[in-house]
Amino acid sequence: MKTTTFANRHIGIGEEELPLMLKKIGVSSLDELIEKTIPANILLKEPLKLGAAMTEREFAEHIGKLAAQNKLYKTYIGCGWYDTVTPAVVQRNVFENPVWYTSYTPYQAEISQGRLEALLNFQTVISDLTALPLANCSLLDEATAAAEAATMMYGLRSRAQQKAQANVLFVDEEIFPQTLAVIRTRAIPQGMVVKVGSYKDLTFTPDIFGCIVQYPNNSGSIEDYREFTEQAHAVGCKVAVAADILSLALLVPPGEWGADIAFGSSQRLGTPMFYGGPSAAYFATRDEYKRNMPGRIIGLSKDKYGHLCYRMALQTREQHIKREKATSNICTAQALLATMAGFYAVYHGPDGIKEIANHVHAVAFWLAEQLTKLGYKLQNENFFDTLRIQLPNNVTIQEVRTIALSKEINLRYFDNGDVGISVDETTTQADATLILNLFAVAAEEPMHDVCAIPGKAPVAAQFQRLSTYLTHEVFQKYHTETEMMRYIKRLERKDISLAHSMISLGSCTMKLNAASEMLPLSNAAWMNLHPLVPEDQAAGYQTLIHNLSEQLKTITGFAGVSLQPNSGAAGEYTGLRVIRSYQESIGQGNRRLVLIPASAHGTNPASAVQAGYEPLTCACDENGNVDLEDLRAKAEAHKDELAALMITYPSTHGIFEEEIKEICEIIHACGAQVYMDGANMNGQVGLTNPGTIGADVCHLNLHKTFASPHGGGGPGVGPICVAEHLVPFLPGHVSTGNLQNEVSAAPYGSAGILPITYGYICMMGAEGLRRATQTAILNANYLAACLKDAYGVVYRGKNGFVGHEMILECRKIHEESGISENDISKRLMDYGYHAPTLSFPVHGTLMIEPTESESLAELDNFVDVMVHIREEIAEIETGKVDKEDNVLVNAPHPEYEIVGDAWTHPYGRAKAAYPIQSVRDNKFWINVARIDNTLGDRKLLPTRYGSFE
């Protein structure tokens, strides 16, 4: 084994282990396994044309040279992105820490208490600063949060408004341009009409159901929306506000002047700009709207012994359960960045946050005074951080731009000739003086002696915040680096991640996030670039984006790529919007139905609804495949209305369906398009591709197939790849003048993630990617062979093999022992493992996806654990142990119970805590017992201030 190649570091199975595994599976070679697993008519005939694989050192040099092409000017463009200081203790211990960035969404709450507490901190920060009682634990970005607010208000229309068909959304003209563009994209398929104008001039009419305003607004002006909000409420309209989260440390918060929803970006709470993302959007609202709010909510609960703990609350709202009835299609959001923003607030505390906000405001105030003295006219009387400057007659915008660039400064240039300056926490006296100097040079005015910037500046009384915030003790205690580091580590020890053991979640692809892929993200040249700088200042990013797009086109067999969607769900929505735009362009806008197999992930029907379609379910047969006759019958019956088929390949049942090309042909014969859900692309790369099977568009999950981390629930990236005829309808961006189908705030979405995937593809090369896919299929079939006798495998392909994942049968176990798949998942925690996917796509089962990154030793240990758990279940079935008091129904067993004085169970502590030798050698201690889900939903406590007393 040549260990110096990256592929051999990434792939867990060595050549010497291959014969043993193949023998267990019952094949003679990897090629034979693939030929018996994937239909012959879709196998690629030639290797991917991706160039030779780079070594880790070569990639480090390459990505370093690209980074050096980015020019880091001092940037005061603002418009939703601002330079900030990421505390080193947070960067080192969270952002660069695999325990935090390789963990999964905290559905298994007992082994996720650390990040659940961190996310509850974030929710508390948002709730306090907005003065609204309920916040979620992040959305994708500010613009998509605005679209979610619009959809939520539309769904909250009164019966009278629905009867009157009120469908007008008023958006104030002083909202960020990219936010308005994303709102428009969402509004069209939902049947909303967007009316843009000045809130001051609005006359409320019965057809208006909601309003969106910005605070401070696009020009930096702080507006008093109290009277406007009262007028809206008087006629039954809701009001949502996009609020600068840092400004709310000084300004009257939206909740105090009547807003129903507040949303925005938490980027300036310590998250770098990353050329547009990722950063965590926030969303807060009133308690009565908790079941209508998008995104995940963390809440308090208790474990079975009454200890306070954390969990994801109100999960039945989510798209994977509600499907087409869900209020949102959001799954992955921005958990890692929300965690960082929460820690930023913990580290600084209320006084520190206020000091930072005061500094920002004071710099802006100082600049306003000095610029006025030079003859410039301020267009916004009340401001927080942003000045809109009218130039004197003797100064042109081009002169200002030229002088600014000569001083390596970026400003914002409005279409009417005004200039914008948005300062931030990094802006120093020297920076502000240099800004002043460039305006003095432009006006040919001498620089007079200027006073120092004060520590704070006055805020007009009507806008001044008087209420307190961040009063919980967590925001008072950890202000030294030592204490902060220990707090982070204390939380970290409560969570299972890929740093601990395999996470075998089916359809989630929890593969290695290699250090060599992650390291570039800590380079300032990738971290600190504003997304709206001139392209020549982002040459490194532009080259990377071009190269990665070409790689993804090659891998998928498609002609075009958009990197804009910020998650897989966003990719689904975007792909469907592209289909709709194409069909409208050829006079087929009447197509309104999307066929979706019954086995599909709930995001598919939820995304279809968001894109303005009506889902139509087609059946699956007893083997888990799409029922071809049902598909054909429904497609032909609705031939003129059918827009698309959404299909996952390999299927959500873990099978490569033999008839996939015929399925696509049936849809195309009806004049419709095929959307391939790329969630399972890890079973395709290098062996087949969406273009070959006959799809027209697919999304990819970079956080699954292409090695970017899950981050405990985000960030994700969901780029879409499309066939030639769909390329003209890919998303544009307001900054380029192309407003078509814009779906995220930044032109390239979460561009800061892209170096990870680029590194993965460059270092794996075509052969490495192909071998990774082969190994993923090998590992899944090995586990199936090892566990089939103990549990049973629900679905197999026609030759008896599974794809890159497989479904374990647990329903018979439940019938005979009373032990559920949930009990098995909780018992796995005692063994140091995260559960596989529960009850999806088949109720009462466990879906397992080992990925290519796991070693044979880890696979064998997992098999030992699963077999041992099956033996524990057998003891219940035979009556050897108590059906009501055993290691499974009582799992997990927290440390405090194991070491406690009282022990009332009929089995010993050692059996509970150390069931096999591998656990004795490396025990992961759990800090809570099984959590009461009902209590946490019945009484939602979504901040750190909650209490069940």
Q: What label would you give each PLM region?
A:
Residues 114, 144-309, 371, 384, ...:
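Conserved PLP-enzyme active-site core in the AAT-like
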Residues 271-284, 288-289, 333-337, 422, ...:
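Conserved phosphate/anionic-ligand binding catalytic regions in large, soluble enzymes, centered on
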Residues 135, 193-197, 379, 412, ...:
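General small-molecule cofactor/ligand-binding pocket signal
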Residues 132-133, 557-559, 587-590:
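Short helix-loop-beta connector
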Residues 27-41, 259-264, 695-698:
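TRNA-binding/sensing appendages of the translation machinery
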Residues 125-146, 165, 169:
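A conserved hydrophobic secondary-structure block that centers on an alpha-helix together
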